[in-house]
């Protein structure tokens, strides 16, 4: 009986620690998203002050990797392997391995190229007017802050850095500061879930 009670206490403690870690992860993700949005807004203001266009690329989005295999969609989900957020803010594209190029889904300016313990290596590209794309869990980044990238230009290489259950690309789109489901635009995909 004593070992069962101790086991229950240990189990509850682990569950509490896991819940606290997930809450920290979600708070960190929200803070990073807010920082990306702030930088995007700052870039738009600078471009407007310099007389540059702040319009988004009207050409639409392209697939950021060659794979079309979706392993997790945006929104509520069971966290794979018990890691990561259950309120998924993007779309995970799998079957990419560790060496696939990641392409800018739209032309724009790199506002973040960094490493974070949750997102791993990641890149955020501003397309103007509060529109951004985010590429996470990269094994390496090919661009730096301030770089203008053309649509289809390589911004990094796929990987599994940060909180990740295996090699994939976590891809996010924001429009006018609101998170948008990437599958609204990237419609020719294979369901992997």
Residue ranges and their predicted role:
Residues 1-58:
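Alpha-helical oligomerization segments with coiled-coil/rod-like character
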Residues 57-193:
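Catalytic cores of peptidoglycan-degrading enzymes
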């Amino acid at each position: 009986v004593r070992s069962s009670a101790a086991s229950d206490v240990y189990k509850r403690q682990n569950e509490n620690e896991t819940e606290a870690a997930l809450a920290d992860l979600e708070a960190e993700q929200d803070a990073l998203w807010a920082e990306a949005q702030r930088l995007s807004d700052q870039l738009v203001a600078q471009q407007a002050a310099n007389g540059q266009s702040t319009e988004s690329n009207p050409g639409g989005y392209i697939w950021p990797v060659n794979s079309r295999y979706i392993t997790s969609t945006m929104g509520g989900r069971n966290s794979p392997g018990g890691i990561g957020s259950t309120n998924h803010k993007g779309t995970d594209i799998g079957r990419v391995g560790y060496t696939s190029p990641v392409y800018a889904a739209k032309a724009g300016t790199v506002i973040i190229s960094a490493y974070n313990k949750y997102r791993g290596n990641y890149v955020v590209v501003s397309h103007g007017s509060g529109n951004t794309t985010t590429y996470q869990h990269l094994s390496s980044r090919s661009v730096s802050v301030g770089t203008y990238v053309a649509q289809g230009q390589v911004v990094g290489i796929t990987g599994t850095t940060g909180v990740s259950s295996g090699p994939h690309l976590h891809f996010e789109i924001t429009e006018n500061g609101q998170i948008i489901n990437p599958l609204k635009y990237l419609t020719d995909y294979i369901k992997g879930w």
